Amino acid sequence: MLGYTLISRMPKTALLLLGLVAACSQRTLTLVDLYSDGGLFPPSLDGNPGNSFDGVATTYADSSAFPADTRSNDSSDGATPAGLRRGLVGLWHFDDAVGSKVAIDSSGNGNDATLVGLDPTLAWVAGRQNGALNTNGLGYASVADSDSIDSITTQTTLAAWVYFDGVIPVDYGTAISRQITTTNEQYYHLSLYQDGTPTLFIGFSASIPAARPTAPQTVAQRHWTHLAGTYDGSLATLYVDGVAAGSRPITGVFPLDTRPVILGGNGNAGAVTEWFPGRLDEIALYNRALSPDEIRLLATAVAF
């Protein structure tokens, strides 16, 4: 029979070691945790240069017993970089050239975003990964309606890295939104309240109260934070840095419409307002609800 030894938290110059070892009648996996200055680092995908091996190991009978963050690259639940492309409607890296008036969509669906009210010589700045869009509360990027955007009906995921400058003069600073009708009840958006508290809005009609899960704490100013929101057909869930921060039950279907998706603003009652005061990076939009493991992987800033 075969067993598996997995060593994580290797020094930067070392390689991840996966060795096959002889065992008796049942497959086992040994997960070796590394230590630094005598402290335990739980198994993780991100690595930490400078850690050293102290010879401590944990054995698992199979991969279903792995700690959650170690299993998040297990293809059985779809939480792989390649799996993150399933159901992708739009992906904006904001790695566009200085002077460009367009943010290219990397999903393959052609949902490029056009800058509105932003100086293209100033809008492109350093980001969480490579470049970012600096809306700075002055404008936004608009994505025209398309068949792929209209495929968002019974489920969705919104995600973005946000760098909050600290001043929101109106109700929200919005990372991504789509108002589906002229009323305020039918749209989705991922935003910060004026005090910097993350919130997700999922609404279908005036007759169905909107779901507004809100985090229990504000985000740090001038610091990159990953926000994500999912709607799976019955529950709206907000995530902050890959961790669920609140949820609300709601059931409905997003109606078809021709209005755009807005990056860095809120299409509120027909006008785009509530611009985001800071930088945005790696905005992703899906026509399905990502799993908690997929959200956690998305928040590790892996390329996909």
Regions found by a protein language model. Name each.
Residues 223-237:
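Localized edge beta-strand/strand-to-loop motifs within extracellular or lumenal beta-rich domains
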Residues 201-226, 270:
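Short, aromatic/His-centered strand-loop micro-motif at the edge of beta-sheets
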Residues 25-27:
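Bacterial signal peptide processing site
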Residues 248-279:
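Flexible glycan-contacting loops in extracellular carbohydrate-active proteins
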Residues 31-33, 50, 58, 62-65, ...:
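Extracytoplasmic low-complexity segments
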Residues 21-23:
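C-terminal motif of bacterial Sec signal peptides marking the signal peptidase cleavage site
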Residues 85, 89, 98-103, 138-201, ...:
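Extracellular glycan-recognition modules
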